Amino acid sequence: MRLKRIAAMLTAAVMAVSLAACGGNTDTNTESSQNPQENAEAQAVHLNLAESWGFEYFYTIITPEVSSSSYDITYYLTSFYDTLFEYNSEGEVVGVLAEDWSMSEDGKTYTFQIKQGIKFSDGSDLTAEDVAKSILAVPVNLGQYNGSYGRLSTIIEDAVATDEYTVELHLTQPYYNTLRELCLANPFGIVSSEQFNEDLTAKQESFRSATYGTGPYMYAGDNDGQTWNFVRNPNYWGDAPEVDSFSIKYIPDNDAKILAMQNGEVDFLSGIKNVSAESYAQMEQTDGFGAQADEKSLQTYYVGYNLNSEIFGDQVVREAISSAIDKDA
């Protein structure tokens, strides 16, 4: 079973349920080596996945700063684009591209020291200028959707590269959630500054042919608009992922996805939008397939009240309902 390899590939896929076909989709060198370690290194691991997105929007959403399409696609973005920060397994914010950071006394200026020696997938060096432009480009490219991923993008006053590896982020007011929102690859994934026009709009034609990030994978083209292919980033600065490449097949119907998995066309499905509870229960009992439900998920759910309702317009009623909910259950 390749569940560990799958997990190593999709570092951003924090989804509720997943199904995986057991066995291998590996290409091996026809000349067998006497050394088992060399044989293992000769294997090329490829995964086939399936999603329901409207891929006519894919090339815009693959740009981190543009968010006018499916939220599901954002799960893949950290495979291509690193962020300044991320959450560790304990839910704490830790640096990724940011090596060190500080905040001014008034809480309106953050200073980030950027790690050195990191390259984009096109081989160019990551510098503070790339980080500053990526941040400034967020509200420009989000446009009418600015603020849809959090408040930070609405209070950016400026982002300045003060030297080759130092960035200052200036806000119009203090904001407690700044570092947490900088963990989001959409919209705060770091992109090569060469991929923005002078007005900071993204060069969409460039993103039709490549991804320009520092993440473990990069875009490798599509097959007639039905399958999108991704391979390892040869310039990746971190530990090389165990999966060499993966493809995302466009299969809009969930039953067709399950059939494709049974036929060996798809290796992995994840998320409740791709796998119904009934299909999950069925495949969990089927030989040759692995099933896993995440025990932890970094998501927020809320219940909103319709204040125009005669019942819920009464604050006492709302407080009574809120008090009756066991929040520790």
Regions found by a protein language model. Name each.
Residues Y71, N88, L184-P241, S245:
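Gly/Pro-rich hinge or "lid" segments in bacterial periplasmic/extracellular proteins
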